[in-house]
Swiss-Prot record:
Belongs to the class-II aminoacyl-tRNA synthetase family. It comes from Methanoculleus marisnigri (strain ATCC 35101 / DSM 1498 / JR1). Residues 1-145 are annotated as: Editing domain. This is Threonine--tRNA ligase. One of its GO terms (biological process) is threonyl-tRNA aminoacylation. It is an enzyme of class 6 (ligase).
């Protein structure tokens, strides 16, 4: 930040014409006598630590004013002091921050000329040796500002409503205990690479893209099928719940004050770039686009709660290179994102319960057992303690509770549900949050019957968490399975037909055609390989149902089927079935779940290797 400080007899300004980034509701004309005029250019470097830039600038202004013996301050945005300016939104945040810090100083009279206006001004400089000073502010170079300590209190609430010491649970060897150990800061497991990293490649699902930025992946047909089915699944859940799908851009202009302020909440882990002379960012969630839609809508309280949903493909977070790993932490990911505009806090609490129930259900449907932590401010807990106990009771399992002494984010309450990986580390997936800032920030409002303007609470909900983390959790969960498998509805191949000899291939193809027509993903291993090798490779592909086709099967029409989920290690479970019984068995397992056809050739002889 660049400051030009002029001790003046008099300064006055008049705002004449708006620019496209002009502050609204600005004071159009003002003046001060015996004042320190502070001409200020907020620079791009200030965006790295706005809080520190504000603190240092305010300290410099206060020190200079006291040295000059004045308590009147005029803050004047003056872009001409620098050629490397911050985004307009960040600049406004800094200027408001400086104003707020100075207003809180005893005896000071503070005025601020508006940002983003063409202004006329007149200034009378006193002309003494200290009347013209310049300062350069670099965030992080001054003495560290004392940070207000946020207190965190942890405890467990049981479904019966009892409050328990969280540390007592940490001694157990359970998924819930693993979550508690992580939240309480216990030393975690180190060194071992997550199980899913090898599996995601071995199963030809997904792998790193070496020609892209780290944390950006390429998806093979088998992985793409699973990813698409999961997306279909979430869409079905959202539509059943009354959500309305939308689609919004992946990039946003940081010159918009609301965008810049919301982006600043997430710190430096953002992809930012220049588009001409505009500072842009890639979204890290679908909030920006949905809030923009809500801002432009005419909202009637009779339409609330209103739920908008987007499968955010892609969202971007510039995670530290050393933290990027597999499908757990990426820089580009797919986030199912629903935002619910509620009428009031009672409506938000009701919707929160409903969406939490959806989150628990996704863990069951995806066969990824979940554990939960509920976080809120102390004020919220004191007001809604009975409600918190109620959602734990409805969940039917104990939950870790974290109570914060003050609000530090846009939410006052949130729940995070997590699967536990093979090393005992949480994989946070579904979440629901009560946002009490964004409606104000983006001017999302409705009018009550008495004409009162209302900026209502907004729920953020990802019913599953990112699609990549869901697959991560499923793969990690297989480490505890004696015979690892995908849920049948997600298996890239649901039935594999293994002809014993070349003469059986035509019969196998006929069955394969009928199975696919019945809505079952089936393929035929027609390669010139031994039956044992074909069966072994079907096992490596985690195919749920494998049927060997020989002379007897061709004659009788009955198939000897190996059922993976009922098998034990080195002890396959086999059952004789008719073709219709096989169809019925698969349909029973996949009932109510989305279906997509094979993404790979039906004949394995025509299937390429990707990895």
């Amino acid at each position: 930040m660049r400051l030009l400080l002029i001790h003046s007899d008099h300064i006055e300004y008049e705002a004449r014409k708006k620019t496209k980034v002009a502050e609204e509701d600005a004071v159009q004309k003002d003046a001060l006598d015996e004042a320190l005029a502070v001409f200020c250019a907020v620079e791009s470097v200030d965006e790295e630590n706005i809080e520190d830039a504000v603190r240092q600038a305010a300290d410099e202004i206060v020190a200079t004013a006291r040295q000059l013996g004045t308590t009147n301050i005029m803050i004047y945005p003056y872009a001409h002091l620098s050629s490397d300016l911050a985004s307009p939104g960040a600049a406004v945040s800094v200027l408001k921050g400086i104003e707020g810090a100075l207003v809180g100083t005893d005896g000071f009279v503070v005025k601020r000329a508006p940002f983003g206006w063409y202004k006329a001004f007149s200034l009378s400089c006193k002309g003494h040796p200290l009347s013209e000073l310049s300062r350069t502010i670099l965030p992080g170079e001054g003495a560290a500002a004392p940070k207000k300590e946020i207190e965190h209190e942890f405890f467990v609430i049981t479904p019966e409503g009892d409050r328990k010491n969280a540390a007592d649970y940490a001694k157990e060897e359970t998924p819930f205990a693993a979550l508690i150990r992580k939240e309480l800061g216990y030393p975690g497991p180190e060194g071992a690479e997550p199980v899913h990293v090898d599996l995601m490649r071995a199963k030809e699902l997904v792998e790193y893209e070496p020609r892209a930025d780290v944390g950006n992946h390429r998806w093979m047909p088998r992985g793409k099928l699973i990813r698409d089915l999961l997306s279909d699944y979430v869409l079905t859940q959202v539509l059943d719940y009354g959500g309305m799908p939308v689609e919004t851009p992946v990039m946003y202009d940081l010159g918009d004050a609301a965008i810049a302020e919301h982006a600043a909440k997430f710190g430096e882990r953002q992809y930012r770039f220049k588009s001409g002379n505009r500072d842009m960012m890639l979204r890290f969630a679908a909030c920006f686009g949905m809030f923009s839609i809500m801002h432009d809508m005419h909202i009637s309280p009779n339409t609330l709660p209103m739920k908008l949903y987007e499968l955010s493909t892609y969202s971007f977070r510039h995670e530290q290179k050393g933290e990027v790993i597999g499908l757990k932490r990426l820089r580009a990911f797919t986030m199912p994102d629903m935002h619910t505009l509620c009428r009031d806090m009672d409506g938000a609490l009701t919707a929160f319960e409903e969406q939490l129930a959806i989150g628990w259900k996704t863990g069951e449907d995806l066969e990824t057992p979940l554990v939960g932590v509920f976080r809120c401010t102390r004020d919220f807990f004191e007001q809604y303690e009975l409600w918190v106990k109620g959602i734990v009771a409805k969940s039917g399992v104990p939950m870790l509770i974290e109570v914060l002494s003050e609000r530090t984010h846009y939410w006052i309450a949130k729940v995070d549900l997590a699967a536990i990986d093979a090393q005992g580390r949480p994989i946070e997936n579904p979440t629901v949050q009560i946002d009490v800032e964004s409606a104000d920030r983006f001017d999302i409002k409705y009018y009550a019957p008495d004409g009162t303007e209302v900026h209502p609470p907004i729920l953020h909900c990802s019913p599953t968490g990112s699609i990549e983390r869901v697959i991560c959790a499923m793969l990690e969960g297989t480490a505890a399975q004696e015979v690892p498998s995908f849920p049948t509805w997600l298996a890239p191949t649901q039935v594999r037909l293994v002809p014993v000899a070349e003469r059986h291939i035509c019969f196998a193809e006929e069955i394969d055609t009928r199975l696919n027509a019945a809505g079952i993903r089936a393929d035929v291993d027609d390669r010139d390989e031994s039956v044992n090798k074909k069966i072994r490779e079907a096992g490596m592909d985690w195919v749920p149902y494998v049927a060997v086709i020989g002379d007897q099967e061709a004659e009788t029409g009955r198939l000897m089927v190996t059922i993976r989920k009922l098998s034990e290690k080195k002890k396959p479970f086999k059952e004789s079935m008719t073709e219709s019984e096989l169809v019925q068995a698969v349909k029973l397992e996949t009932a109510g779940k989305p279906f997509r056809p094979l993404y790979t050739p039906r004949l394995l002889s025509r299937k390429p290797r990707f990895i």
